[in-house]
Regions:
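Bacterial N-terminal signal peptides that target proteins for export
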Residues: 1-11
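Surface-exposed, polar helix/loop patches in the mature regions of secreted/periplasmic/lumenal proteins
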Residues: 90-130
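General structural signal for secondary-structure boundaries
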Residues: 3-4, 43-46, 103
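Short S/T/G/P-rich N-terminal loop/turn motif that feeds into the first structured element of a domain
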Residues: 14-86, 92-99, 126-130
Length: 130
């Protein structure tokens, strides 16, 4: 009876450890994502200031979705080709969260201003799973 109890307990412990390991692997499988904007030319500097002078910054909106800015700069060193005049990158836990960030009312307004004041492109890059 004692042996049967020990075997049953060992099997249950193995199932529990296996389930925890599968959950851990599943959690690691989702790669991070990066929301990226490259501005190649600012056509209307005064109009573009409307983005930088907004009362609520993109960092606050990104933070609500678990994201954070990793670059927001005009200090760019070209290695090959013509560099953008401004570069923005924001890291998120997933492509879905990066897309949700781009679909917020805040970003829709920013994108509309950027579309009329700059020559730019924006995209989401899927990163490597950790």
């Amino acid at each position: 009876m004692k042996t049967q109890y020990t075997v049953t307990l060992s099997i249950l412990a193995g199932i529990g450890i296996g389930a925890a390991a599968v959950q851990g692997l599943h959690a690691q499988a989702k790669p991070p994502a990066f929301f990226v904007v490259e501005i190649s030319k600012i056509n209307d500097a005064e109009g573009f200031k409307a983005i930088t002078q907004r009362p609520r910054g993109g960092a606050d909106v990104a933070k609500e979705l678990g994201g954070h800015y990793i670059a927001r700069t005009d200090k760019i060193t070209a290695l090959d080709g013509t560099p953008p005049v401004r570069f923005i990158a924001c890291a998120f836990d997933s492509v879905e969260k990066a897309q949700a960030f781009n679909n917020t009312p805040y970003m829709k307004e920013v994108n509309a201003i950027r579309d009329t004041t700059t020559q730019a492109r924006s995209f989401i890059v899927e990163g490597m799973p950790e």
